[in-house]
């Protein structure tokens, strides 16, 4: 627009100033002096974009083609260019969101896309009124508000517009100066200003001038490029050192504050040709140009706000100072000022209407006012000496009339009274401020804001605005709060005037003459303070002197107010009182009687403090705001009015904001939180704050049902996650769920912030949660040090805060779908075994039903109400108005075999209905249809956190209890409830009975069943109350329990109904979703019911912790658990999670790990010949997830289905929960369905093109798609599909033979029984694992083969597959070993193809070929890594190595020996392999994590058929990585570099995180010692679980991941170990120990950390000599786990 020729500008000017003014007025905004809309090109086009950016855009649009700066591609439109250059960014495939053109790094892809508009010049959003274009819709809409105001009511709307304008200016950054100019957003401010609109001649060429050196440029780009040379020259005022964003702001500041005009090199005024000066007078639109006063107004305004003439016809420029005026009269008036200055007289400037002036004078005299022009201005630029205050006060004392009662009331000395008056604004108006209400104070005219706040609007520095000011004054007086009445004016006219001004706080009559004694400090140069004094201010000359003299004028005022309101004394008296007792009364702020009083005080204060300061600042030139806000131009004159806080150095643009701010200082805000000491500035802020206490999240996304406390967050969520672009779509998808005020009140008053253990009132629920960790961390059993309660399911990294863990997952585990992140945060740090019960007893005793625990309020007491519902213990009566479902403690089955009914919790929270104990009772539980209960997505699918925590505590305690714990976890019901409370992944509670060793395998299974039925992971209030929950930090920290927030996925929102069958699915789904991190699945997998007794413990733990996943996995806990329990005490372990929890139990974190580990542990436990990893859907899924191999995943899912059927048919072998789930429905279906369950309610469903998975967010699908990127070729995919199916059968078969045998071998006769009972489910799972793993391995081999073939092509994929395959192979081997150990193990594997190297047989040739390739790679990798790894395991480790090079060598060594050795060796390997394999698996998982790191778990079936987007390729093995960091870590697997060394055991690690995690093993070991052998075993299991978790989590990507990868590999190995180890545990214990010891002197512990695998157990048994010394905990935990497995 600037480009428009001067002619156009002229034309617009020709239209005459009137036209211009009218056009300007249509803008409806008054820009303060600074707002200089660019010259209006033409009235018709008033709002041309005045930004250089816009001009650029327009110039660009004029071009016929646009060239890409990167590839020179020619685009015909800017939009094409935008879309094209955006592609350059996506090509990098990185996650750093950096611009490929300028390298700028942005926070998100959307920000980067928006940023690209800068380079393309496209401004897609255009104002329909004025045509201005914007890069963002928000900016355009903000701009549109300019036009929303009535064009004719520009004056009226002026005040609001400044705000917007200002915001615009500050927010929108246009090209350098243009930005500030834009701040005068008057649409009329065309780009003319940018062009030399002043130089009409030059304008013809549209020349751009550098505002610093005035160099000319023909295009904006040239100017912008040139401006970069001045980037280091800050725009700073040489006089007052204030900095400005734009040159224009600096010019305006100098002209207004320092009266310095820009000058050219010759020293002559340089305004009209200065491109930095805004062109045009449209900013004068704030007043009617037809008004008689317009000449004077425009003269005064133009003297302060420099403008350039746009029209040659209408050029009214002063020859002396080069200032331009819109009309001749204005110029004439202005010239008089020069004449007067020359004469040295400051004669009043001739007013167009002298008569009016006289009238005004008389009127003002009556008011005790006088024109500033009549008062000889005292230089105000020199700051007043501090004693000025005293002087001023003294003068006031002398000159200001005192109200008779004023001083007398408090017997204040006149001086005091004066000071009081000064300090009080609206109160007895400051005598000072009243001393002169010269109009000038209105130099910034007072504008009465709608809120009755007074805004000082600097109008002109040199002339006063008489009428407007008076009107404002009157208005202000009228608006003054009635309470603040002024004493009669001493010199005021009689009653009438007094009556008028009675309420006008500040206007107290003063002598007409300015006090001679007053020294102006920062008054505007032209005025003396007296003149400046504005209505409510003390003389500006006293900065915040009142503060110094008195407690603070504001405070005094507030006190006075308080006194006033309280004592009813005259405001003045009150004021004095307050002043006298300075801060004494401030504390009584709350005592302020009414908000009115507060408001009036604040108003008084605001005007007073803010005005005093404003004037000082404005006059002084500390108008930072003015200068700062070039937007001021856009804003009406009042725009420049800044409101500085009297108590601090903050400056506000609006009096309302200042008022609210002052309240915060005075503490008189009526909006105070009744729970904590928070004082809100306004009601909305208080409401938002209260939600932090109530946990209310009223705004719910209708698509995914995620709740938000603030609507803006929900809107952003819809835009980013659901791609809702339009306001209509967004509004349509936001649901507001209001909760009754009573609920909120109750919530706020509820004792949800009081610690039930120590009675401390934490004020905030969040603080309580954090505080509870101190109790949870104290292990009552003395076992746990205060551990960080939140653990990453993927890498077992521990965090003190959940948000930190979530952040970690977002950053490190990119494969984890956002919707599943909650499930990856494990509340690992439950109370110690003893601790949990104790804590629960104290916290949840009532609910738990444990008499001992009964003393304490249920945990629910700690829980904040969700959506206004309080979580209360059953014993606590809900507030009368809050309808809460009370769940009697009895409602929770004391029988630990009975699962807790979490659905009730959900009900309680949701007010579904009050249900009686029957719900909780097992019988009622079964009848209870979980399917009717919504799945609470807000509760992590793995209730593992809580479950594991619960399990852990109970387990820790239950080592003794475990015998009886199965059915009755412990004598104390509380622990039991905690166990039952533990939910399976499916949300089913895992009953503590699981912990019982072999003693009660079946009963635990039943509880599992019960919990499984409770597929809905909802903690009932009772559950919440249950001591275990309380005790477990997991619960406390558990989002579900602790979060008072509106149910994240609102509990109210029904999730897909979960029937008994569904629960398994739900469980599976949850498991899968949680398994999205393979670790979860692994853990969720049934732990091989290794040793019955040990297994029982482990299983119990697992059952608790792992059970959760298992439960989730196991739709029918009964079926799953029963077989497990009956066959093996580890039946609970059959839930991988449950098993894992056992391991976790000791550490508490093991729960999480246990989960993942649980999967592996279960496989170990199921050493009965079934490779848990390869057996059962869960194992398969776990592996799939761990390996993140889409192919494998799909097969596993299918296998799960097949296994479900097959398992049902051949259930005997697999007695794990998976079988139940499988029985319930095909594991795959269940997994998928479970996964789907999470989003069933989502309105938006995006289906994965490669698999059945559905995602609510595009980002989730995107992430998930990565799981398909590593998948094998289509053939492989087909093979994978076949594998999946075959895997199922294999799993079934394998588990039957291998699993059973393994179990037998492992001493899991009970497990066999359990397997037989749960054969279908568990057998399926074990088969699924064993077979699945073998088939998987076969498939993996085939896939591997395919991948191997394609591996070269897709090294990353292949390696992932290979790793997966290797893992599967290891599992296979383990399974085979198990099979060998248990005759059925190998036989059950219907492997028609046998591996020449390891003798393993595979169903699919592809699997076999991949398996062989794995061997082939293994050797090299082993050589690379440790050279010790056998070919078979080596390959797995190798991938892991690649992913986690540091640990790879050891892992490779471990796994290699297992893999490479002969079948006998193989068994040893398998046994050891689990450890090594685990490391390999971990590595593999890690690699996969790297490879598939994002959604790898997301797509169960989809085979990766997409091109690998990982751009970083390993030059050695061609493996691909997402980031250079991952590649660097991976290279360590080739270089053998292990830069991190454990100081305790000298073990070295590739990744720092691995070292950190490893060191935790030592810490845990110490804890484990406290907990006892079982605890140690559990702990080690936990570690393994952690490792698995870590690796399974596909954490290879991060160092943590990498480090975890070895651990994960170990876990994987362990899983395999579990599989193999179950069979080989006894056989290969020695081998494994030897190998692990040899291969991983220090890793053994980790490798063995997966004690869940029988092999691991065996190994641990054997290893104790070498490894246990190094890792006592590992040894202990592993030993325990192994013992369990061995049993």
From Swiss-Prot:
Biased composition range(s): Acidic residues: 1343-1355
InterPro entries hit by this protein: RREB1 (IPR052795), Znf_C2H2_sf (IPR036236), Znf_C2H2_type (IPR013087)
Compositional bias segments (type: Basic and acidic residues): 175-197, 944-961, 1322-1342, 1416-1426, 1480-1499
Start-end of Basic residues biased regions: 163-174, 1150-1163, 1558-1572
Gene Ontology MF terms: DNA-binding transcription activator activity, RNA polymerase II-specific; RNA polymerase II cis-regulatory region sequence-specific DNA binding; RNA polymerase II transcription regulatory region sequence-specific DNA binding; zinc ion binding
UniProt feature, compositional bias: Pro residues: 994-1006
Keywords: Activator, DNA-binding, Isopeptide bond, Metal-binding, Nucleus, Phosphoprotein, Repeat, Repressor, Transcription, Transcription regulation, Ubl conjugation, Zinc, Zinc-finger
Residue ranges with Polar residues bias: 1093-1104, 1192-1202
Entry keyword annotation includes Amino-acid biosynthesis: no
Cellular compartment(s): Nucleus speckle
Full protein name: Ras-responsive element-binding protein 1
């Amino acid at each position: 627009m600037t480009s428009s020729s001067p002619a156009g500008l002229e034309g617009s000017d020709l239209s005459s100033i009137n036209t211009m003014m009218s056009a300007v007025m249509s803008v409806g905004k008054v820009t303060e002096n600074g707002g200089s809309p660019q010259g209006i090109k033409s009235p018709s086009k008033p709002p041309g974009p005045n930004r250089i950016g816009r001009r650029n855009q327009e110039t660009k649009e004029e071009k016929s083609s646009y060239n890409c700066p990167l590839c020179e591609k020619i685009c015909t439109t800017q939009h094409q260019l935008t879309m094209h250059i955006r592609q350059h960014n996506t090509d990098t495939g990185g996650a750093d969101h950096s611009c490929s053109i300028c390298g700028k790094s942005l926070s998100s892809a959307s920000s980067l896309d928006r940023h690209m508009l800068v380079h393309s010049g496209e401004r897609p959003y255009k104002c329909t009124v004025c045509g201005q274009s914007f890069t963002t819709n928000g900016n355009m809409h903000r701009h549109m508000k300019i036009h929303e105001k009535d064009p004719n009511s520009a004056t009226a709307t002026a005040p609001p517009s400044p705000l917007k304008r200002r915001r615009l200016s500050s927010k929108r950054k246009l090209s350098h100066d243009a930005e500030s100019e834009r701040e005068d957003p008057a649409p009329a401010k065309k780009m003319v200003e940018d062009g030399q609109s002043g130089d009409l001649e030059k304008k013809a060429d549209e020349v751009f001038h550098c505002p610093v050196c005035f160099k000319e440029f023909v295009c904006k780009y040239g100017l912008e490029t040139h401006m970069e040379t001045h980037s280091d020259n800050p725009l700073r005022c040489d006089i007052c050192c204030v900095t400005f964003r734009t040159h224009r702001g600096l010019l305006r500041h100098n002209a207004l504050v320092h009266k310095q005009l820009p000058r050219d090199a010759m020293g002559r005024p340089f305004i009209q040709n200065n491109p930095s000066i805004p062109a045009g007078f449209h900013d004068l639109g704030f007043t009617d140009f037809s008004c008689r006063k317009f000449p004077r107004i425009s003269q005064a305004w133009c003297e302060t706000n420099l403008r350039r003439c746009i029209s040659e016809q209408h050029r009214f420029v002063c020859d002396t100072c080069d200032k331009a005026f819109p009309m001749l009269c204005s110029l004439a008036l202005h010239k008089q000022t020069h004449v007067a200055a020359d004469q040295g007289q400051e004669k009043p400037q001739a007013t167009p209407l002298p008569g009016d002036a006289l009238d005004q004078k008389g009127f003002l005299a009556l008011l005790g006012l006088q024109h500033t022009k009549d008062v000889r201005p005292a230089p105000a630029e020199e700051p007043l000496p501090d004693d000025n205050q005293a002087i001023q006060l003294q003068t006031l004392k002398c000159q200001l009339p005192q109200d008779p009662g004023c001083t007398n009331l408090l017997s204040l000395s006149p001086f005091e009274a004066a000071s009081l008056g000064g300090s009080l604004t609206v109160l007895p108006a400051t005598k000072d401020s009243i001393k002169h209400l010269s109009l000038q104070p209105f130099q910034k005219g007072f504008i009465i804001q709608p809120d009755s706040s007074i805004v000082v609007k600097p109008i002109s520095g040199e002339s006063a605005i008489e009428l407007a000011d008076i009107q404002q004054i009157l208005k202000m007086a009228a608006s003054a709060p009635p309470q603040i009445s002024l004493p009669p004016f001493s010199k005021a006219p009689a009653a009438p005037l007094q009556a008028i001004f009675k309420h006008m706080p500040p206007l107290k009559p003063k002598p007409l003459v300015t006090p001679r004694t007053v020294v102006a400090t920062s008054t505007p140069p032209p005025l003396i303070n007296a003149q400046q004094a504005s209505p409510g201010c003390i003389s500006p000359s006293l900065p915040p002197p009142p503060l110094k003299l008195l407690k603070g004028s504001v405070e005094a005022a507030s006190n006075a107010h308080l006194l006033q309101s309280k004592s009813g004394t005259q405001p003045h008296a009150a004021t004095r009182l307050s002043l006298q007792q300075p801060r004494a009364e401030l504390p009584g702020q709350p005592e302020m009687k009414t908000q009115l009083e507060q408001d009036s005080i604040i108003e008084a204060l605001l005007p007073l403090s803010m005005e005093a300061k404003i004037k000082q600042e404005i006059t002084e030139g500390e108008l930072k705001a003015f200068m700062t806000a070039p937007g001021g131009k856009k804003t009406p004159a009042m725009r420049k009015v800044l409101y500085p806080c009297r108590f601090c150095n903050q400056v506000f643009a609006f009096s309302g904001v200042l008022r609210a701010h002052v309240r915060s200082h005075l503490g008189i805000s009526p909006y105070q939180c009744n729970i904590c000491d928070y004082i809100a500035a306004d009601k909305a802020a208080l409401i938002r704050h209260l939600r932090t206490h109530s946990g209310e999240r009223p705004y719910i996304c209708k698509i995914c049902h995620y709740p938000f406390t603030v609507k803006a967050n929900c809107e952003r969520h819809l835009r980013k996650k659901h791609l809702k672009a339009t306001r209509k779509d967004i509004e349509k998808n936001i649901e507001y769920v209001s909760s009754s005020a009573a609920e909120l009140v109750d919530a706020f008053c509820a004792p949800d912030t009081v610690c039930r253990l120590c009675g401390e009132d934490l004020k905030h629920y969040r603080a309580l949660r954090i505080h509870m960790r101190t109790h949870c961390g104290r292990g009552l059993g003395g076992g746990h040090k205060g551990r960080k309660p939140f653990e990453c399911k993927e890498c077992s990294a521990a965090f003190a805060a959940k948000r930190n863990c979530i952040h970690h997952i977002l950053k490190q585990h990119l494969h984890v779908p956002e919707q599943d992140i909650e499930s990856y945060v494990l509340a690992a740090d439950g109370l110690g075994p003893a601790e949990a019960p104790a804590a629960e007893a104290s916290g949840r005793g009532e609910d738990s039903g444990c008499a001992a625990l009964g003393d304490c309020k249920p945990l629910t007491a700690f829980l904040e109400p969700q959506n206004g519902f309080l979580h209360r213990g059953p014993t606590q009566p809900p507030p009368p108005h809050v309808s809460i479902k009370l769940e009697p403690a009895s409602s929770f089955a004391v029988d630990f075999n009975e699962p807790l009914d979490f659905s009730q919790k959900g009900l309680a929270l949701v007010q579904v209905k009050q249900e009686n104990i029957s719900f909780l009772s097992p019988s009622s539980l079964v009848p209870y249809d979980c399917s009717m209960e919504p799945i609470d997505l807000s509760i992590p699918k793995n209730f593992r956190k809580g479950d594991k925590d619960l399990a852990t505590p109970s387990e820790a305690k239950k080592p003794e209890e475990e015998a009886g714990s199965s059915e009755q976890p412990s004598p104390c019901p509380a622990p039991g409830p905690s166990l039952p409370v533990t939910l399976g992944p499916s949300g089913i509670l895992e009953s503590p009975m699981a912990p019982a060793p072999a003693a009660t395998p079946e009963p635990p299974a039943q509880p599992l069943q019960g919990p499984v039925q409770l597929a809905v992971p909802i903690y009932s209030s009772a559950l919440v109350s249950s001591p275990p929950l309380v005790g477990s930090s997991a619960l406390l920290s558990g989002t579900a329990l602790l979060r008072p927030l509106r149910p994240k996925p609102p509990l109210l929102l029904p999730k897909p109904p979960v029937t008994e069958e569904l629960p398994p699915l739900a469980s599976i789904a949850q498991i899968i979703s949680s398994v999205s991190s393979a670790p979860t699945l692994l853990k969720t997998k049934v732990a091989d019911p290794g040793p019955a007794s040990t297994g029982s413990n482990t299983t119990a733990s697992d059952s608790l912790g792992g059970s959760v996943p298992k439960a989730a996995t196991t739709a029918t806990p009964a079926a799953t658990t029963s077989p497990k329990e009956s066959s093996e005490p580890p039946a609970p372990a059959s839930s991988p999670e449950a098993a894992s929890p056992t391991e976790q139990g000791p550490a508490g974190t093991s729960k999480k790990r246990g989960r993942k580990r649980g999967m592996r542990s279960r496989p170990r436990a199921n050493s009965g010949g079934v490779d848990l990893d390869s057996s059962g859907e869960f194992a398969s899924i776990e592996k799939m997830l761990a390996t993140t191999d889409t192919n494998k995943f799909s097969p596993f899912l299918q296998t799960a289905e097949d296994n479900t059927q097959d398992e049902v048919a051949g259930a005997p072998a697999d007695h794990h929960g998976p079988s139940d789930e499988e029985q319930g429905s095909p594991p795959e279906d269940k997994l998928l369905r479970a996964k789907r369950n999470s989003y069933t309610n989502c309105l938006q469903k995006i289906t994965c093109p490669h698999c059945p998975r559905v995602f609510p967010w595009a980002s989730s699908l995107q992430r998930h798609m990565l799981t398909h990127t590593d998948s094998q070729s289509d053939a492989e995919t087909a093979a994978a599909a076949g594998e999946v199916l075959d895997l199922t059968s294999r799993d079934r078969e394998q588990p039957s033979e291998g699993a059973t045998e393994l179990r037998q071998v492992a001493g899991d006769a009970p497990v066999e029984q359990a397997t037989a009972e749960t054969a279908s489910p568990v057998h399926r799972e074990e088969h699924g694992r064993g077979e699945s793993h073998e088939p998987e391995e076969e498939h993996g081999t085939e896939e591997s083969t395919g991948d191997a073939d394609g591996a070269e092509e897709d090294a990353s994929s292949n390696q992932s597959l290979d790793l997966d395959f290797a893992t599967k192979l290891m599992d296979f081997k383990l399974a085979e070993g198990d099979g060998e150990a248990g005759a059925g193990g190998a036989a059950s594997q219907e492997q028609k193809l046998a591996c020449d190297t390891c003798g393993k047989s595979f169903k699919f040739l592809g699997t076999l070929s991949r398996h062989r390739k794995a061997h082939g790679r293994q050797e090299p990798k082993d050589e690379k890594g440790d050279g010790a790894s056998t070919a078979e395991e080596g390959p797995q480790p190798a991938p892991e190595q690649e992913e986690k090079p540091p640990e790879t060598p050891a892992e490779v060594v471990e796994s290699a020996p297992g893999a490479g050795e002969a079948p006998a060796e193989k068994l040893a390997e398998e046994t050891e392999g689990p450890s090594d394999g685990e490391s390999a698996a971990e590595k593999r998982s890690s690699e996969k994590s790297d490879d598939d790191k994002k959604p790898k778990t997301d797509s169960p079936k989809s085979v990766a058929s997409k091109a690998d987007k990982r751009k970083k390729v390993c030059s050695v093995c061609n493996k691909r990585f997402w980031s250079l960091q991952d590649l660097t870590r991976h290279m360590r697997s080739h270089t053998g570099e292990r830069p991190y060394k454990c100081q305790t055991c000298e073990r070295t690690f590739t990744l720092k995180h691995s070292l950190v995690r490893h060191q935790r093993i030592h810490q845990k070991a110490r804890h484990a010692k406290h907990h006892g052998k079982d605890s140690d075993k559990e702990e080690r299991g936990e570690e393994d679980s952690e490792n698995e978790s870590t690796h399974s989590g596909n954490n290879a990507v991060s160092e943590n991941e990498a480090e975890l990868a070895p651990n994960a590999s170990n876990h994987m190995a362990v899983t395999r170990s579990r599989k193999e180890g179950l069979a080989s545990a006894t056989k290969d214990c020695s081998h494994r120990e030897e190998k692990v010891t040899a291969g991983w002197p220090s890793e053994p512990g980790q490798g063995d950390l997966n004690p869940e695998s029988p092999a691991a157990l065996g190994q641990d048994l054997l290893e104790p000599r070498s490894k246990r010394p190094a890792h006592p905990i590992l040894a202990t935990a592993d030993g325990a786990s192994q013992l369990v497995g061995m049993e």
